[in-house]
Amino acid sequence: RQMCIRDRGIYIKYDLPQVYHPVSRKPLKPHYLLDRNIAILKLFPGISPQVVESILNIPGLKGVVMETFGSGNAPCEEWFLNMLKEAVDRGIVIVNVTQCRAGSVEMHRYETGHKLLEAGVTSGFDSTTESAVTKLMFLFGHGLTPDEVKEHMNCSLIGEVSIPETFRP
């Protein structure tokens, strides 16, 4: 899949031939049912248990977009994986996206990805952080359960994510 955005930063340069054009010319229908109980957990070398715990224990939190390294790698320390699992067990949906400017999360590629899957983390594939946050806000805003949200995170609603053929049910 080619990227629609050629370059991003303060200014966005679009690769216009790649921009999604809907088949229908219906008027824009904004969605206002958004749940803002979402957080971003940006991983960095040496992240402490206190930082992770403070984010995962935000009152009312429903979803976390976790920015990982490379193709979805994260620390493998027991405290970290336990905190993620405990949050998932409480019904918090954790979505794994890459911090890289391009690329995709491949949780089956490395041992760290397998451990995240075991903890209940959901792949964001090639979603951007912003796209994953918005999608979580939309899905929770429409009253979906955590399991339903996870299921919808594994499919493209409007072209916001590329799901590998090998992953599709």
Where are each of the predicted segments found?
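C-terminal non-catalytic interaction/assembly regions of soluble proteins
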Residues: T68-P169
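Accessory alpha-helical/coil subdomains and C-terminal extensions
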Residues: Q2, R6-S71, C76-E77, C155-P169
